[in-house]
């Protein structure tokens, strides 16, 4: 599988011209400036490889399909594969597993005219979560200094890990149906998502980022009264954070070569247009590389596994109790991570 993936990366130079069109700041519907993903670059192997592209999951009348960003449009890879009569990855998960790579090469190398019908404008596209069936969704608690301070939590001596399940996945422009019979205190947490690209076990901090396929914008949505139903001394991370739809992620899975240093990214949350969180990943207590090295010392990480790296200050939980106005049905949440794009969802 790894040999196939390396071959594809070497041969991917045929898409360099198309890749240079990816993710311009003027891309419709995805914001500008710091929230807009960067243009494609030439990969370390001398070609615009898979980690130098931005991928997504499209929801179409024919079913979900792998998508590839091309400036202000998205290429429906599945539809393009049918037009060229080749087998391609059906999802980002299959892309990460190395499936359908020969057909994908042909789609990427095809003249623009032959796949024109497979292009859809970004503003007309419907998106699913940018990963669909990770084996593991690993979350981090209290991993930003100022967030730990606002919640009066001592800095952890090791990464605080917990998990979510696939039922929590939610796509861009999705709707979270709040479990109001069980909880009332709903909160936002913008987080940089790390998507693994290679199997990792006991990897070093120095090598850790080489196992990453890409990054995404996500939100560790939380029900605080479930999380702390037994008091702050007995946090119930799982039940407070793993209800249906409680991990919006995407729309873009942005290749690691486009993002560069994951410790220099602006992160923001807006609620109904009001900025609530505005920070930078340089405030992390444990870096992405340290998190991967630590997690891989405990269990094997596989392609497609998600690591959500913690949230910065500005959450409702961190405010004085008299100022805590919890989220409610009808609220509109916008999250952004620099170079990864903007994620939007609504509460119902």
Where are these regions (language model features)?
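Non-heme Fe(II) oxygenase catalytic core, chiefly the N-lobe of the double-stranded beta-helix
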Residues: 167, 171-226, 230
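Residue-level recognition of short, solvent-exposed, well-ordered loop/turn junctions
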Residues: 132, 139, 187-189, 302, ...
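Structural signature of FAD isoalloxazine-binding scaffolds in flavoprotein oxidoreductases
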Residues: 69, 155-172, 188, 329-338
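N-terminal non-catalytic cap/leader segment that marks the start of a structured domain
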Residues: 5-6, 10-12, 30-159, 332-334
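N-terminal export signals
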Residues: 1, 7-30
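Catalytic-pocket segment enriched in acidic/His residues
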Residues: 177, 222-348
């Amino acid at each position: 599988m790894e040999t196939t993936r390396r071959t594809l990366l070497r041969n991917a130079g045929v898409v360099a011209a198309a890749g240079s069109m990816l993710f311009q700041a003027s891309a419709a519907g995805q914001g500008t400036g710091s929230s807009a993903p960067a243009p494609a670059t030439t990969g370390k192997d001398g070609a615009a490889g898979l980690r130098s592209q931005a991928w997504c999951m499209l929801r179409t009348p024919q079913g979900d399909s792998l998508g590839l960003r091309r400036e202000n449009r998205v290429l429906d890879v599945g539809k393009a594969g049918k037009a060229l009569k080749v087998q391609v990855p059906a999802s980002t998960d299959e892309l990460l597993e190395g499936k359908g790579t020969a057909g994908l090469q042909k789609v990427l190398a095809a003249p623009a005219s032959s796949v024109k019908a497979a292009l859809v404008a970004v503003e007309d596209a419907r998106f699913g979560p940018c990963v669909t069936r990770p084996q593991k969704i690993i979350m981090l608690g209290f991993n930003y200094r100022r967030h730990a301070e606002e919640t009066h939590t001592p800095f952890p001596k090791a990464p605080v890990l917990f998990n979510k399940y696939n039922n929590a996945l939610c796509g861009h422009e999705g709707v979270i149906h709040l479990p109001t019979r069980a909880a009332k205190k709903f909160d936002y947490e913008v987080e940089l998502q790390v998507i693994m690209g290679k199997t990792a076990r006991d990897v070093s901090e120095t090598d850790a980022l080489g196992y990453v396929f890409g990054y995404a914008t996500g939100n560790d949505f939380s029900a605080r009264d479930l999380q702390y139903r037994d008091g702050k001394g007995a946090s119930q991370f799982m039940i407070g954070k793993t209800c249906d739809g409680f991990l919006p992620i995407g729309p873009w899975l942005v290749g690691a070569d486009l993002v560069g240093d994951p410790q220099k990214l602006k992160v923001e949350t807006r609620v109904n247009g009001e900025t609530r969180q505005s920070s930078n990943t340089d405030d992390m207590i444990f870096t992405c590389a340290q998190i991967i090295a630590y997690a891989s010392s405990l269990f094997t990480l596989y392609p497609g596994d998600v690591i959500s790296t913690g949230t910065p200050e500005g959450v409702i939980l961190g405010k004085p109790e008299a100022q805590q106005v919890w989220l409610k049905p009808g609220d509109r949440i916008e999250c952004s991570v620099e170079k990864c794009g903007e994620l939007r969802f609504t509460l119902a």
